[in-house]
Amino acid sequence: MPPLPRSQFLETRDGIRLHALVWRAGEVHTDRVESPVVLLHGGGANAHWWDHLANALSTRQPVYALDFRGHGDSEYPESRHVGAFNDDLEDFVGWLAREDVILIGHSMGAAVALDHASRFPATRALVLVDLARGGNPTTGRRARLALSLRRTYRTRAEAIERFRFLPESSHASEALRAVIGGQSVREEANGRFGYKFDPAWFSLPSRPRPDLAALLCPTLLVRGSESLLLTSDAALAFAREVATARLVEIAEAGHHVLVDQPERLLAEIASFVATLPAATNSSSS
């Protein structure tokens, strides 16, 4: 049986309690200094969306999956501001005391990872899984609208049964949907059951895009071949603009590549990481 993650909590600069899952920190012994991997979920998701991938990623280095504020088992603050998730990641990397992280983000998490790497050149590598760019605006608006509505259910079982990926996924297995759904439900104060994210975050405007010219680390952009949120043209334009970027497209996958084709995604990440130069222990000051 693969090892289970442990939970870790830390406090941000503004006093918010963040939760992260940790795989094998302090247990990996190799003859190389390996950078920590930090997994970043998309909007309305949580750290457990990475459970089925994290053990395979943690064979040579520790792996952390962060719950952004207002998501998962992190604190749900009353006040919200643009850039809060970016601050969460910056504080988390500071807590790790290692700047040379390998950031792997999906959707919103990819956008946060991209922003961080463009501002912190010690970032060792970046994997952007279906970063939303140039996609169908109607699909994007519908997904944001659906996420902005708070739905609750009478029982936990009903909430798990009604759990869906947004945008809808036609390739994810029913078993994986149910497992992630089970990790995405929480009991509300009124005794009903809802999902582990605060819908109010989806009414905020987007943070300005980072300067891609400032991105220096090796970067892998992964596009689902059927994605409606990252077009082929936008992915190609990104790869042309970022000198350190490599683009791969995974067949039979939509926006949620990590649940549609997890084994293929793992293979692409492993191939990419194998090309990285040897790490050095770059500690935060």
Where are these regions (language model features)?
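Active-site loop/oxyanion-hole signature of alpha/beta-hydrolase fold enzymes
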Residues: R13-I16, L21-E27, H52-N55, Y64, ...
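Flexible "cap/lid" loop of the alpha/beta hydrolase fold
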Residues: L114-D115, R124-R156
